[in-house]
Amino acid sequence: MKRILITGGAGFIGHHFVVHLLKYTDWEIVVLDRLNYASTGFDRLRDIKVFDGNRVKVFTADFTKPIVEGLAQELGQFDYIVHMGAETHVDNSISNPEPFVIANVVGTMRMLDFARLQSNLTQFVYFSTDEVF
């Protein structure tokens, strides 16, 4: 069975992606999310897990920090990583850019570091923002 890691899987787009994967694949889905203000999402994921709790595992962690060995072992190996975890509400970055740089730049670097440890990884997908134009 294929395994996929989704950062930001409790967010608005992320949880819809989890639902899509549950419906159209037999993959094991692992969600890594900070569950901060933007993701009222544990409620979203709880509702999904009722649908198929055996295939969805949720880990709460801050991916802007290096993924420690214990968490890396618990997460395991993945065939795919979809990185959509980010600081949202981009208009707030005008007055306070630091959290956005940390989450959106440093967080992506940390996920790429984690991806290098994956011996089975075939694809790393990065979601950007609807504010890029």
What role is predicted for each listed range?
Residues 1-133:
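N-terminal Rossmann-like NAD(P)+-binding domain of SDR-like oxidoreductases, especially those catalyzing
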